[in-house]
Amino acid sequence: MHAFCVGQYLEPDQEGVTIPDLGSLSSPLIDTERNLGLLLGLHASYLAMSTPLSPVEIECAKWLQSSIFSGGLQTSQIHYSYNEEKDEDHCSSPGGTPASKSRLCSHRRALGDHSQAFLQAIADNNIQDHNVKDFLCQIERYCRQCHLTTPIMFPPEHPVEEVGRLLLCCLLKHEDLGHVALSLVHAGALGIEQVKHRTLPKSVVDVCRVVYQAKCSLIKTHQEQGRSYKEVCAPVIERLRFLFNELRPAVCNDLSIMSKFKLLSSLPHWRRIAQKIIREPRKKRVPKKPESTDDEEKIGNEESDLEEACILPHSPINVDKRPIAIKSPKDKWQPLLSTVTGVHKYKWLKQNVQGLYPQSPLLSTIAEFALKEEPVDVEKRKCLLKQLERAEVRLEGIDTILKLYLVSKNFLLPSVPYAMFCGWQRLIPEGIDIGEPLTDCLKDVDLIPPFNRMLLEVTFGKLYAWAVQNIRNVLVDASAKFKELGIQPVPLQTITNENPSGPSLGTIPQAHFLLVMLSMLTLQHSANNLDLLLNSGTLALAQTALRLIGPSCDSVEEDMNASAQGASATVLEETRKETAPVQLPVSGPELAAMMKIGTRVMRGVDWKWGDQDRPPPGLGRVIGELGEDGWIRVQWDTGSTNSYRMGKEGNYDLKLAELPAPAQPSAEDSDTEDDSEAEQTERNIHPTAMMFTSTINLLQTLCLSAGVHAEIMQSEATKTLCGLLQMLVYREQHRSWCTLGFVQSIALTLQVCGTLSSLQWITLLMKVVEGHAPFTATSLQRQILAVHLLQAVLPSWDKTERARDMKCLMEKLFDFLGSLLTMCSSDVPLLRESTLRRRRVCPQASLTATHSSTLAEEVVALLHTLHSLTQWNGLINKYINSQLRSITHSFAGRPSKGAQLEDYFPDSENPEVGGLMAVLAVVGGIDGRLCLGGQVVHDDFGEVTMTRITLKGKITVQFSDMRTCHVCPLNQLKPLPAVAFNVNNLPFTEPMLSVWAQLVNLAGSKLEKHKIKKSTKQAFAGQVDLDLLRCQQLKLYILKAGRALFSHQDKLRQILSQPAVQETGTVHTDDGAVVSPDLGDMSPEGPQPPMILLQQLLASATQPSPVKAIFDKQELEERMSRCCFWRRRTTKLEQILLFIRRMNSVCEKENTNATASN
């Protein structure tokens, strides 16, 4: 080109052509497309919500909710009319078929057997049919034998007899007993003698009895009202025809299949992958198919991925319904009958053939509906048709959203599906709240035919399965991208809109689409939808999302410290000392300095201005600052103003009229405590934080829904969910949402309780209950919640299946309770802190239950619950009796001469002490004071729960019906008595009566006769005698355990009538003198009968008490419990201090020796 240029050639710029990013462009057409997607999503959502409840449905709600209408209408067509004048009903179908014939044909098509035609012939009194005549003869013969005949005999055409036949047909149809009636007339075909059919099946007998009662009721109505039989029976016949001709049976195969067939059930995700891997090598070994077939199979597999995750023909009844091999076509019923009566796994078939399970409530409900003076008008039919119409509109809505996505996936912008699904969930950018989306696809359509229900559930299941698949795709792409770029999740608290801290899951391009998918799944799901979601890997996807989001805090310890700040496990005596009120200055510069503008004042000590402040009470308000000359200006309530001396010449004319406003109380002393979660909703609105909240809400929703529907869910789905909860609690990742209290809230059914009480769960919960140092208020809360969870799930255990586990767990609980009562290791940190704070060895007394006693009371309540259950009662009784017999062995092994009370108890270092104390504590209780987590009574609020104790001794209580907490002083609360031990569940055999008699004997022993033994183990002055302490503690628990006998008066009378065990023969005093025993059995008249236990208790009770008679029983019991727990804690601390002193003395000796050698 240079050769053809004229002049100087200018080189062009080397800049490339800039191609704009299509994703960042916007135009009116693009906005229109998004808005149309939003509107179409809203339209589909309104269709899915369908029509609201009509006034007619609300009016007829009583009968629509009864068991009669549970099958719905016989027809599944919407275009159904009812001629009210001619009392005819029909479906708008082509052709002119009469109503009766169309009904009969539809019944035959619906049921697919001959029972409906047989029942229809009975209702029409077609005695020309041999089967009908034979059946009616058998019924009449049986009614005569059992005296179920009416006093008046009516001809077959009489209205009363017509009512009887129609009611008989209705009961047989709605109880699904038509096949039973047919079996009675096919005795020849079955090869069974006619004699055996004289005794009808129990289900048919119950039907005959209801029919007889209905006939008697009609006769009575005719006699009382004086109307003709035709007038009395006409409305009854109308209602019975409605039940027979228009309603589907309440108990039928269709409904049974619906309940047994897991429509949306699917295998767990990992099992499907494993089966797919196993099938691949097998496909390689089989002969290769033609290419066209392979291509079709490939396309079919790709298209059926969603269907495979949604629908799987997995039903527990498939195994039962295998075709039975028939030996001979002539004798086809005999092998069937032998199979039914011989094999237990064909229980469902035996029920269908023999009708073994009649439903008495349904029989009475049908009879009540037929005889009730209420016409079956067209409104009830309209109610049932309204539900059919609502179901079709809802199906149209879900079909619309699925078709819209398929169109938008291939032809529309990527942002259009987001707008469309926002409309589906009614999330509009601006405007008023238009309500919540549909939560249950079967809402208000319970009475539609089974096929329509299945169609609705399957279609909605496709939408949920599609949402799970999209979430999986987004998370897999995000995980691969983060791994490629080396992005590590950061703590969620460091991510804000001002400081994004780099890329995160909430900032990826698909984040908004992921949020809307999570929101779509956060609903109250039914059992079938839960099976689909849990087995499709939804829980794993949620865990992946949380991993990509990052931890919610820097460390678990910070969370622990934050939650434990300002909390205590008990109320110490020192925290209840109230500070003296500050005396306000009467005069002086301090008083003048407190007078600010607006302060209310009155005349003071130096007042000399007459009645300027009148009329009484003479109050005013400061309106000017105090001047340097010592004058201040005041406006009185009368309106006059003047200046007064406040420091001038040393005079003070005014004083304060009211106390100054006190300082604002701290957060822990406020009167109310609301949830802090509501305050954090607007604190962090970063997309990643929103993603975290949405994921947590999805997990909580799935857990709560599973707790409600676990009885009809797949066991694999329930195990998957409970396995995730167990893993979170084990790794201590549950503090944000999966707390032990939340896990307890879903333990509602036997299925969930059985899964939550597996060996892994029990081991984990016992580890939490036993706890570990440091023992804080937060750790005590976790221990209490773990005990409550055990109390919720352990009643589901079956003794035949888990007898060994029950015995091991019961022994572990008693051992742990014994260690708590003997060691009190969890109270040592509290004692040490109090000691170091006060610089003295004597600790402060606890006004509420301590850490150890609170936990011990919870374990005792758990054992009380288990002891009331049949499967646990025998094990616990056996353990209690074995421990109580140790007292008997002590009596038998020690001489009565010169024996003291503590001689009958095991040594303090004996392991038997813990077991004995645990058993006595279970029978008699431990500590009746206020405790954390316990139920208390407030004067104004009633029964509340203690949830927190502040460091200043204030107690936070929570209502059971709301989340608002209140802070109350200790003196406003009273403990609610716990559930007492039920002595009636103990076996009082003759050997155990003697054991209890010896316990009562120890409880009533005379304390002044026992000499306190000086321990030789005391290392320094002031150390507690462990033997004496243990003796006093056991004596206290024996006294409490004896009170449990008050509710068993007959056994208590037998125990108190037994002879008392004499304590001593002679008692030696310190100076060597001998004191004769006070046996009371020697008199001038001769020997008297031996003393019984009742006399011994009376003698002990009338002794002079060393305690003043100003304390009631409750105060004495609290002082004794406090003394025992305080002494045990003191003993533990003394051992620690003794060890420290010994170590210090050893170190001092070594230092002295080293100095001397140098």
From Swiss-Prot:
Pfam families: MIB_HERC2 (PF06701). Residues 587-660 form the MIB/HERC2 domain. Residues 281-302, 662-684 are annotated as: Disordered. One of its GO terms (biological process) is protein ubiquitination. InterPro entries: Mib_Herc2 (IPR010606), Mib_Herc2_sf (IPR037252). GO terms for cellular component: cytoplasm. GO terms for molecular function: metal ion binding; ubiquitin protein ligase activity. Residues 293-302, 668-679 have a biased composition (Acidic residues). Gene3D superfamilies: SH3 Domains (2.30.30.40). This is Putative HERC2-like protein 3.
